[in-house]
């Protein structure tokens, strides 16, 4: 069964064809990073206009790469939230138009669930129950997954998401956008010598990174930071220490079979290394290309929703504030 996935929740226009939820036949992405880097962040109106220019060519390319026609597509999986409203609308309307014209079933996919399904697109299929650490620019969640479509939120950020914290730290240090990769690169040539705080929030699986960001800002303003690379390495280590420790503790408490990593920040080299080395449980870490926004994960998630009987009508709306448990 072939599923066409479409993703346009932020600044990547993507389309993919995935077979049986696990086999990627194509995965095309049109990135807007070079455009938004001029502004130091994503400009919603610019993003939606770029999606309009890219959406149909990207879908066409994905079908051609997969050597698949629309008559072979069993369903269209489309991200309908969370994300930027203007960006989501472009992808959703394109999916609706194709679905209506070709009478193809439509399946709405939660973008956060899609990230988790990166772990079904390589290697060994995950076992339930599993704990997923989903870390991105807008979310930092610990999600217990007891089966397909069964999500329980165990921990979340109380302020800045990990990716958002990296972006803010990069701006403080004068590094480029996007901040996560910039911090990661700078850290390669630095040492974690700064004593930055970690917010553990005893008795909770929640996260908090705003205090860490403020501490870095104060050190920079006081002139105590002499090396940008050392500051980047110190900040990165503080974030990763908290993510890894709280994830492992949560996994042990809920007696899961394995840990899954997902989201854009899952591409961080130190996080990938530390989580795999420190966990006594098996850890599933997606390839770099499946961590950032893409449509293959949307198609995979959509497949499992579709075979369980889930479908959506042409009246489906975008849900910019959708949560992982919605």
Curated annotation (Swiss-Prot):
Its cofactor is Fe(2+). It is found in: Cytoplasm. Keywords: Acyltransferase, Cytoplasm, Iron, Metal-binding, Transferase, tRNA processing. Substrate binds at residues 134-138, 167, 180, 184, 268. Its EC number is 2.3.1.234. One of its GO terms (molecular function) is N(6)-L-threonylcarbamoyladenine synthase activity. Pfam families: TsaD. Binds 1 Fe(2+) ion per subunit. This is tRNA N6-adenosine threonylcarbamoyltransferase. Fe cation binds at residues 111, 115, 293. Required for the formation of a threonylcarbamoyl group on adenosine at position 37 (t(6)A37) in tRNAs that read codons beginning with adenine. Is involved in the transfer of the threonylcarbamoyl moiety of threonylcarbamoyl-AMP (TC-AMP) to the N6 group of A37, together with TsaE and TsaB. TsaD likely plays a direct catalytic role in this reaction. Signal peptide: none annotated. Its main location: cytoplasm. Transmembrane segments: none annotated.
């Amino acid at each position: 069964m072939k599923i066409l996935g479409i993703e346009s929740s932020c600044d990547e226009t993507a389309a993919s064809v995935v077979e049986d939820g696990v086999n990627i036949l194509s995965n095309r992405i049109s990135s807007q990073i070079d455009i938004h880097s001029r502004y130091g962040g994503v400009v919603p109106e610019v993003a939606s206009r770029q999606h309009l220019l890219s959406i149909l060519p990207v879908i066409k390319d994905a079908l051609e790469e997969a050597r698949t026609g629309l008559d072979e597509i069993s369903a269209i999986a489309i991200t309908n939230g969370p994300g930027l409203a203007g960006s989501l609308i472009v992808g959703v309307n394109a999916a609706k138009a194709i679905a209506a014209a070709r009478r193809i079933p439509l399946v709405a996919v939660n973008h956060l669930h899609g990230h988790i399904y990166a772990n079904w697109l390589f290697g060994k299929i995950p076992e339930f129950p599993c704990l997923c650490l989903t870390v991105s620019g807008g979310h930092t969640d610990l999600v217990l997954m007891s089966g397909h479509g069964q999500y329980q939120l165990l921990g979340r950020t109380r302020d800045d998401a990990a990716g958002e914290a990296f972006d803010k730290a990069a701006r403080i240090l004068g590094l480029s956008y996007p901040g996560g990769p910039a911090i990661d690169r700078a850290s390669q040539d630095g040492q974690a010598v700064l004593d930055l705080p970690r917010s553990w929030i005893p008795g909770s699986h929640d996260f908090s990174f705003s205090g860490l960001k403020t501490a870095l800002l104060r050190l920079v303003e006081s002139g105590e930071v002499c090396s940008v690379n050392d500051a980047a390495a110190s900040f990165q280590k503080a974030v990763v220490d908290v993510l890894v420790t709280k994830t492992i503790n949560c996994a042990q408490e809920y007696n899961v079979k394995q840990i899954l990593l997902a989201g854009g920040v899952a591409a961080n080299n130190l996080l990938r290394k530390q989580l795999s080395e420190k966990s006594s449980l098996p850890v599933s870490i997606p390839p770099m290309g499946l961590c950032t926004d893409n449509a293959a994960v949307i198609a995979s998630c959509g497949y499992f929703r579709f075979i369980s009987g889930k479908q959506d009508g042409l009246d489906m709306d975008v849900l910019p504030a959708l949560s992982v448990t919605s």
